Amino acid sequence: MKQYAIQPATLEFNAEGTPVSRDFDDVYFSNDNGLEETRYVFLGGNRLAERFPVHSHPLFIVAESGFGTGLNFLTLWQAFDSFRSAHPQATLQRLHFISFEKFPLTRDDLALAHQHWPELAPWAEQLQAQWPLPLPGCHRLLLDRGRVTLDLWFGDINELTDQLDATLNQTVDAWFLDGFAPAKNPDMWTPNLFNAMARLARPGATLATFTSAGFVRRGLQEAGFTMQKRKGFGRKREMLCGVMEQHRMPTLSAPWFYRSGSEKRETAIIGGGIASALLSLALLRRGWQVTLYCADDQPAQGASGNRQGALYPLLSKHDAAINRFFPTAFTFARRLYDALPVSFDHDWCGVTQLGWDEKSQQKITQMLSLALPAGLASALNAEEAEQAVGVTTRCGGITYPAGSWLCPEQLTRAVIALATEQGLQTRFRHTLTSLVAQESRWQLRFTSGETASHETVVLANGHQINRFDQTQPLPVYAVGGQVSHIPTTPALSALRQVLCYDGYLTPQNPHNQQHCIGASYHRGDESTVWREEDQRQNRQRLLDCFPDAKWATEVDVSGNSARCGVRCATRDHLPMVGNVPDYHATLTHYADLADNKTSAAPAPVYPGLFVLGALGSRGLCSAPLCAEILAAQMSNEPIPLDASTLAALNPNRLWVRKLLKGKAVK
């Protein structure tokens, strides 16, 4: 299994209080005045003060080659806030900053470095509060209520730029070419990086860098930038600035997974669960007009209606895509839920998954071999597990200290209420029966006979996403399940964390003195009828896993209190996020894909029709990032996921994988 460790930066502070990298023997910023140097080199070198007021798009995108202490980002954020205060009516409303860092600082070192610039404290404190764990890949931080987005890519920039999705091509407005000096870190300053910068730069994009090294100037020129020298900051004689004046048409490396968005920011979302709610917020933040159609009388009547749900990442012993996606999705979910200005029952108590038999112990051993950061997942022996969860288990496992339980029903309703305050239009008791494309719009028809017309449509209606002609071929299936509600007892009330075994048991909700235990699993079953056998099995699985635990015998399901729901799942346990693929066109266009990959056209899709679904049993974990991914795609904005993992979420993936191998799609 692939190791997921990212090495943190090792640094010390010199006599001037400047952080110095031990790995590269170089300062993170100038001893003289790092803040002023950033303003001169990167903000001034890219002419941002004069460009912001005349920018013709609501979003300005900056990319950077080395995040370091975040000085460049914080300085830019401060300047952007000043611009917004001075020009509240300007077209430019939001800032998106993309940065790469191979050796991220620890949160403590970051805070120490930030003490150097007291005037940046209001922005630095927000960055520190959301500072991510050292996981490889992209970490999206939503700051200042979403007006500022920071994408932190942890890993080697020369490797990461090769892994970026094609939708990021020609989107960057300005480049900050920063990092340790070329003489100290020659591995970063490569033609591969310069070519990637050119590929990502939109026509007219600028760049600035502190160095004036000849090989850097020549490399950027060869990549396509028009370069010039400028007076350097302070004692430095020269620096470099550049402009992308060429207009290139980059090739698509995997056109069968290409994603397209929409220039028309108006949509209908079909659904009423957590995915619909979070997508509404993400689109509203980007200036969309959003109408939500829900078949029920109120939100959260489907799979999102449970009283308690566990929040922790899915890990796999064999699927690299799962192991890339879910840890990132989990950390994003925690940041988002923490920041939401709404109330819902929850407890960030942690989740512990136990190895109660040989098979489950082997699975946990394989999960631990991923070498995930301790802040995300770590091993527990039997004694440590009992101390963590508060009850006798007599077995060890893996613990997720940032895991939790929360009330999906309350969360969903609160988010939809928040979105309504921000402009969301809601239509309840609207059951969609069909979608018809009419003159670049979609006509929606409901059981009541009512119709509506929208520019774009998102299907986020759980296990019913494949009820329409366009989506019927999607390889998804329904999973019925029953969660039992049980009263607490003195012994059960000792449970401090969510306990996962061949089922799960939550700590009591102090607002109702009840636990949730579950859940039964019925593939292909859409029934929501209460079942006595499911109630009994929910209890029996706990007793089977912990036969010697007296506290487990106190689980009482005789009150017959439970909730039945239906989830939507896929064979590979990953969500479906993106354009709705045209099944018949896909099979026709890609009939000889295995032998003609180089000439393949972009994936056939239904224009303006999207899907967000198949979240399975980990919707609380995956829904926030999936909603953010789809909102970014629909808005033609940077997507916070590498191309390979993003392909693993594409609704057409199961068909395309077979076609790439020359196999028949059934």
Curated annotation (Swiss-Prot):
Biological process annotations from GO: methylation; tRNA wobble uridine modification
Region (FAD-dependent cmnm(5)s(2)U34 oxidoreductase): 270-666
Subcellular location: Cytoplasm
GO molecular function, one term: tRNA (5-methylaminomethyl-2-thiouridylate)(34)-methyltransferase activity
Its biological purpose: Catalyzes the last two steps in the biosynthesis of 5-methylaminomethyl-2-thiouridine (mnm(5)s(2)U) at the wobble position (U34) in tRNA. Catalyzes the FAD-dependent demodification of cmnm(5)s(2)U34 to nm(5)s(2)U34, followed by the transfer of a methyl group from S-adenosyl-L-methionine to nm(5)s(2)U34, to form mnm(5)s(2)U34.
EC number, UniProt record: 2.1.1.61, 1.5.-.-
Protein's recorded name: tRNA 5-methylaminomethyl-2-thiouridine biosynthesis bifunctional protein MnmC
Protein species of origin: Salmonella paratyphi A (strain ATCC 9150 / SARB42)
Residue numbers spanned by region tRNA (mnm(5)s(2)U34)-methyltransferase: 1-245
NCBIfam families assigned: MnmC_Cterm, PRK01747.1-1, PRK01747.1-2, PRK01747.1-3, PRK01747.1-5, tRNA_MNMC2
Catalytic activity: 5-aminomethyl-2-thiouridine(34) in tRNA + S-adenosyl-L-methionine = 5-methylaminomethyl-2-thiouridine(34) in tRNA + S-adenosyl-L-homocysteine + H(+)
InterPro entries: FAD-dep_OxRdtase (IPR006076), FAD/NAD-bd_sf (IPR036188), MnmC-like_methylTransf (IPR008471), SAM-dependent_MTases_sf (IPR029063), tRNA_MAMT_biosynth_bifunc_MnmC (IPR023032), tRNA_MNMC2 (IPR047785), tRNA_S-uridine_synth_MnmC_C (IPR017610)
Principal location class: cytoplasm
Names of the cofactor(s): FAD
Family affiliation: In the N-terminal section; belongs to the methyltransferase superfamily. tRNA (mnm(5)s(2)U34)-methyltransferase family.
GO cellular component terms listed in the entry, alphabetical order: cytoplasm
Keywords: Cytoplasm, FAD, Flavoprotein, Methyltransferase, Multifunctional enzyme, Oxidoreductase, S-adenosyl-L-methionine, Transferase, tRNA processing
Highest taxon listed in the record's lineage: Bacteria
Family matches, as Pfam families: DAO, Methyltransf_30
